[in-house]
A protein has these predicted regions:
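Polyanion-binding surfaces on beta-sheet-dominated domains and ring/shell assemblies
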Residues: 1-148
């Protein structure tokens, strides 16, 4: 049986993270830690979960992107303010997590959409959904500036 939230939230996820290159608010290159989905899955099993998987959800036309609003920037580039959704299964628990389709902290425009970005967004949705619902990796988001 999977350990409870209060136990899992105490696991330091940082040593299990990989790093990706990004830029800070001033454009300075930085490295940002992220927990790979496969490592997240293994940690769940190591902490008592028997069955762990996620399913990318499809929209009404069979695609993996959900659109919330079409927006044009000053150069007339278009984005649908896209997001993805996954259904996460951990033993007898099932929950859904939505995640915006982003390129780091940048908007993904229609002319830069690709399958890798969509797949990465599904993986991020899984990891963040696990953190919210189980506590595993939750501390990785404690300093996130979600309201900016």
């Amino acid at each position: 049986m999977l350990k409870g939230f209060n136990e899992l939230v105490q696991i330091d996820g940082l040593p299990f993270c990989d790093k990706r290159k990004a830029k800070d608010d001033n454009g300075k290159p930085i490295e940002v830690p992220y927990l790979p989905w496969a490592k997240c899955k293994m940690l769940l099993h190591e902490n008592g979960a028997s069955e762990v998987y996620f399913l990318p959800l499809k929209n009404e036309t069979g695609g993996y992107l959900f659109q919330s609003k079409e927006v044009h920037d000053k150069n007339d580039r278009t984005t649908g303010c896209y997001f993805v959704s996954v259904e996460i299964h951990i033993d007898d628990k099932t929950f859904r997590m939505d995640m915006p389709l982003m390129n780091g902290s940048l908007v993904v425009y229609d002319d830069t959409l690709n399958q890798l970005r969509i797949s990465n967004a599904h993986a991020r949705a899984f990891v963040k959904g696990v953190a919210i619902h189980t506590g595993l990796g939750f501390k990785l988001w404690l300093n996130d500036k979600d309201t900016e």
